[in-house]
Curated annotation (Swiss-Prot):
Positions of ATP binding: G14, T15, S16, L17, D18, G19, V20, D21
Gene label: anmK
GO biological process: 1,6-anhydro-N-acetyl-beta-muramic acid catabolic process; amino sugar metabolic process; peptidoglycan turnover
Catalytic activity: 1,6-anhydro-N-acetyl-beta-muramate + ATP + H2O = N-acetyl-D-muramate 6-phosphate + ADP + H(+)
Stated name of the protein: Anhydro-N-acetylmuramic acid kinase
Amino acid sequence: MVMKSGRYIGVMSGTSLDGVDVVLAAINDKVVAQQASYSHPFPYELKQKILAVCQGQQTTLSAIGRLDYELGSLFAEAVQGLLIKTGLTASDITAVGCHGQTVWHEPNSHTPFTMQLGDNNRIAALTGITVVGDFRRRDMAYGGQGAPLVPAFHFAVLGHLTERRIILNIGGIANITTLLPGSPVKGYDTGPGNMLMDSWVWRHQKKPYDKDAQWAREGVVNNKLLGQMLSDHYFSRPAPKSTGREYFNMSWLEAQLVNFPDIPPVDVQATLAELTAASVSQQIMLSGGCERLLVCGGGAHNPQIMSRLSALLPGTEVCPTDKYGLSGDDMEALAFAWLAFRTMSGAPGNLPSVTGASTETILGAIYPVINQ
């Protein structure tokens, strides 16, 4: 198999909706070398439209179609922003790997499906660059969860022959990849990451997130509320499993708070931070533990969560992936650049041991342009 080496751009917009992350990387079958990154702002009105769809409010086919168009335009703008920053042109890029914006993910129903919006045809037309997108549905077609897909990238770039490592990504949802020598790679969503904390601080302080956990650190964890939250059936389900904003959202949190009407909002924030740390730690211990926990995503900047992980996992070194040369803020965008490289090379991109698919498969669809 001849691998299609070159410069790739990865585009990621996660469940936190805090911006569009774009990275440039030189990729071949041996090396993924990040060369530049760029964060493109997410328009407030567009964010609110997406939240309305994600949280199960009524929508229409027309509204979904308009969102698909608007997100395609936004992702193209983000790619162009990176090109301007680097001085490169479309002809310098082999392909763009675009994850799209997940608005619904339902892998466990009788008719499992996942939906990511952001018209890849439009991205290709506006940028003049071949686009690889729609990565998740091929895995689901083979019986997989369609998620998480990033563990295959973690294994390729952070796997170790002898050291027990777990990669923790704390985005809107938190997920782990277990890289344990002699065992198949596993990866799954542990539960809420930043999503509930972000929504709660927005409701009460109109801030997009709790910077440096300043608010959470002023509060006191309510152990009864924490115990009730951790009794949710999702946390006890066996892997592989995946979840998202369609489940862990403000409606879920409000239902949890019905029996706790007098808890101060600041204590709820502290309890949500502890929920993330506790649910992650539980899953890590169930997997057999690790020597090193490498953390990426926005939550790696949350000192409260990082310190609680260290306390809950004695004997484990907790450190950011940046220590190993991989930007934690750009990890997922890098992964989709790498997945685009795999697809363009005709190579599989999923790990059945992670997603539960019946076979390895080439992921996504290619949207080529003429004379690139």
